[in-house]
Amino acid sequence: MTEPIKLTFELDRKQMISANDRLHFQKKAKITKFLRQLAHYEGQNTLRDYFGLPFNEGKPCKVIVWVFAPTNRRYDPPNWSPTSKALLDGLTDAKFWTDDNYHVIKSTDFRHGGKSGNKKYRIELEIVNE
């Protein structure tokens, strides 16, 4: 299938990790585990046969990370890379791709998506055939 796969995650700020955060390693590990399990669960609910998953070296993809913030404050979308990395690892666990290395995921782009419309952040992963 050539249409993109879109996965949406609604998260509180306390459920996310920014590159600017200076967290204790145990707290960071707990949040990472939560995000990874959440993405694994969402990945299991995706119609893998319909989308022709898993992606592999012969069938690479690219990932676009859309960040929707709850306020109009300025921020840097790439600062949410620790959050998106944990989500991508969860999708690896769900067998979305054979591995999340550069042979399979050719690029990861971070983009501002606008306001989330509520008090939570919304992270949308758009996975497109390369």
Regions found by a protein language model. Give the residues of each.
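Catalytic phosphate/metal-binding cores of nucleic-acid and nucleotide-processing enzymes, i.e., regions
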Residues: 1-130
